[in-house]
């Protein structure tokens, strides 16, 4: 499984979640831009990705159009207003929120 991690703080205070994913053989792709990604940057990063651990980056219809393998978006933070949830639902992409993580 290929996981895009856009949040720069994910795993910063506790490495256990990252370690668990690596132990399962998952490929973790960290945010190489080190800032909240623009729509264009997200469009470049999502092809071939199965899951996104999402910070404040925007997941629009245009981003989802490029996400050919995406199955789940897990919002690492508060709220999901940065995700086109209606479009994700149409495509059968699950959207979750990780509570109490910030």
Q: Predicted segment positions?
A:
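Phosphate/diphosphate ligand-binding glycine-rich loop within oxidoreductases
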Residues: 50-102
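N-terminal glycine-/charge-rich "phosphate-binding" loop or analogous flexible N-terminal tail
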Residues: 1-49
């Amino acid at each position: 499984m290929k996981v895009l991690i856009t949040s720069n703080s994910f795993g910063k205070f506790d490495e256990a979640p990252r370690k668990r994913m690596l132990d399962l053989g998952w490929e973790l792709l960290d945010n190489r831009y080190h800032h909240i990604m623009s729509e264009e940057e997200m469009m470049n990063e999502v092809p071939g990705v199965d899951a996104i651990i999402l910070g404040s980056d925007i997941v629009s219809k245009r981003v989802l159009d490029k996400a050919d393998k995406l199955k789940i978006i897990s919002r690492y933070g508060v709220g999901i207003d940065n995700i086109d949830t209606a479009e994700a639902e149409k495509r059968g992409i699950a959207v979750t929120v990780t509570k109490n993580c910030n």
